[in-house]
Amino acid sequence: KQIEFEVRSTGEPPQESKSRCLFSGAPIGFPYIRAEGRAGRMGIQLLAVGSKGESGRHFFVPDAAQTNAALQADPSGEVGELPLPKAGLGFRVQKYGLTRWSDLFSPRQQVVLEAAATEVAALHSKILVDGGTPEYARAITSMLGLCVSKLAQSESMLCTWRTRKGSSKIEKAFGQHIVPMTWDFAEANPFAGSVGDWMGTVSS
């Protein structure tokens, strides 16, 4: 069953709870949630789309094209089978059926990171063709490779939406040596000039 949500700018949000249904208010035990996750019955649903306007950021209910764009992203799957550690201090997602590194990224986020990594890898030979030295090519691609790693901090399903006074923003993932479970996440646009922007990542 899928629940449809509305975007509103007035009223009070529902009380925050990690173990209660937002729709019915019924309690949901963590053993049940974890079992559903391990059975592959937990998915993702696009709830809202944010855009920047003259008077600030605005949020809208996604239309069919935006929803389809999120669902139709097709990553290569080359890293899909790389497993997460079976257990570890601060690693909590495995209990919910997230056992591979690819489980920490939405299909669209995987496409972004794969594209960035592929372009950076191709730069080495291009620099040599243009007359650069092997040392220079290694230095450039190594630095940009680190930028791809940094981009993953903003392109992950562990990124939450931080609501605060003034302008809200995406809270980056992997800021600490923990991989916690998150119940909603924000997808960054790598070309929007905000958190997760590729050029901002490179210049910082």
Show the residue positions of the predicted features.
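Nucleic-acid modification enzymes, centered on SAM-dependent nucleic-acid methyltransferases
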Residues: 1-204
